[in-house]
A protein has these predicted regions:
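Divalent metal-binding acidic/histidine catalytic loops
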Residues: 1-190
Length: 190
């Protein structure tokens, strides 16, 4: 892979992965590659979604899964100079973003949700995982994702207050679903 061509995106938009596939690949090699990529997510939050996605197929990896794992390596080759930079500021600002897809996993129709928290513009905490439930609408998916990120935001606020970094102001969590935002402002019958 040292002589490979770099790519600008981690995964081709609109790609759907499935457990069924044409040809199996060496599971040990696949697990080693995914393990190394998981290690990189500690410092490269941009890898989180795709690495979590391909890690679902470690029991019986197919050729399409390995191709995406190799595409991540090609992406890394083109983004060696990318990093997270932390800058000091008297005014500390904690901001969260959350997003999810709706029933994108074609094997069990569960959704993937994720969040990222920024402290003064630099990512300090992030997650991407498959939801444990099957939801019935995109509003419900986004509401579940936002609730999970809010719970983590409460924990993160407590840690930052204990360290003396953050005052007692509220955290803003950004969500891109207007129905989920309205539901969170008026949680009638929820």
């Amino acid at each position: 892979m040292s002589n490979c061509n770099a790519v600008k995106n981690l995964i081709v938009p609109g790609t759907f992965l499935s457990k069924s596939g044409d040809k199996s690949v060496d599971a040990t090699l696949y697990k080693q590659l995914v393990g190394c990529l998981m290690y990189l997510t500690v410092t490269r939050s941009d890898l989180m979604f795709v690495v979590c996605l391909i890690s679902r197929y470690m029991a019986d990896p197919k050729e399409e899964h390995m191709l995406i794992a190799k595409r991540v390596l090609r992406y890394l080759k083109g983004t060696l100079d990318v990093g997270v930079y932390y800058k000091w500021s008297k005014d500390v600002n904690l901001l969260g973003y959350t997003d999810s897809d709706y029933a994108r996993d074609i094997d069990d129709r569960k959704s993937t949700s994720g969040y990222v928290f920024f402290l003064n513009g630099a990512a300090i905490c992030w997650s991407s995982r498959k939801q444990g439930i099957v939801t019935l609408s995109s509003t419900e998916v986004e509401y579940v994702a936002t609730t999970a990120s809010a719970c983590h935001g409460v924990w993160l606020t407590g840690i930052l207050k204990e360290l003396g970094v953050l005052s007692s102001k509220c955290i803003d969590i950004m969500c891109d679903n207007s129905s989920a935002i309205k539901l969170s402002k008026n949680p009638v019958m929820h």
